[in-house]
């Protein structure tokens, strides 16, 4: 049995979980999320504890077992505490500023780059070179942060670009001069 999948999920106080057939809905103080469980996997709720079970030991069932348990646990974490990714901008003249709920980046291009916040995502600009992406869906927060990072990936020679906070960029040595 999956080591992750067999662990029960404890539902904390203030979180409401509904299992309706193959749809699991989680509602908490920060919002509401739902997930459709893949067909061979079964989710049951008893006495404030969620258990994820699989009917057989086929390879597909085994892989979905741990995945489903982790996705539901991430939903519960999201509606209680939420998720946040911090990004840093490194480079001369590279900066970000908030324009309402959107962001405007100056990244060395001939034009400013605008990023609008999707539903459920909030941006916070701490300094012109630091920003954070937060929301209740771990997947959505990670995807939006990755899309922002993709606007100007860190350069391996000078280290300029957008990076996650604490990310170490592997630097390359430039060509040898005469």
Curated annotation (Swiss-Prot):
Listed Pfam families: Ribosomal_L6
Alphabetic keyword roster: Ribonucleoprotein, Ribosomal protein, RNA-binding, rRNA-binding
Spans traversing the lipid bilayer: none
GO biological process: cytoplasmic translation
InterPro entries per record: Ribosomal_uL6-like, Ribosomal_uL6-like_a/b-dom_sf, Ribosomal_uL6_a/b-dom, Ribosomal_uL6_bac-type, Ribosomal_uL6_CS
Assembly information from the UniProt record: Part of the 50S ribosomal subunit.
Family indicated by similarity: Belongs to the universal ribosomal protein uL6 family.
Protein name (database record): Large ribosomal subunit protein uL6
Organism: Arthrobacter sp. (strain FB24)
Gene designation: rplF
């Amino acid at each position: 049995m999956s080591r992750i999948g067999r662990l029960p999920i404890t539902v904390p106080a203030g979180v409401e979980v509904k299992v309706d057939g193959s749809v699991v809905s989680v509602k908490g103080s920060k919002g509401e999320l739902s997930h459709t469980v893949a067909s061979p996997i079964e989710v049951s709720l008893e006495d404030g504890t969620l258990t994820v079970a699989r009917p057989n030991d086929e390879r597909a069932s085994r892989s979905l077992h741990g995945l489903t348990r982790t996705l539901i646990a991430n939903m519960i974490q999201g509606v209680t505490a939420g998720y946040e990714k911090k990004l840093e901008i490194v480079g001369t003249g590279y900066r970000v500023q908030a324009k309402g709920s959107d962001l405007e980046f100056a990244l060395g291009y001939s034009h400013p780059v605008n990023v609008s916040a999707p539903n459920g995502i909030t941006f916070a600009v701490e300094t012109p070179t630091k920003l954070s992406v937060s929301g209740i869906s771990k997947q959505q927060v990670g995807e939006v942060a990755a899309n922002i990072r993709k606007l100007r990936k860190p350069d391996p020679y000078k280290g300029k670009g957008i990076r996650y906070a604490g990310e170490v960029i592997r630097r390359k040595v430039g060509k040898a001069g005469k």
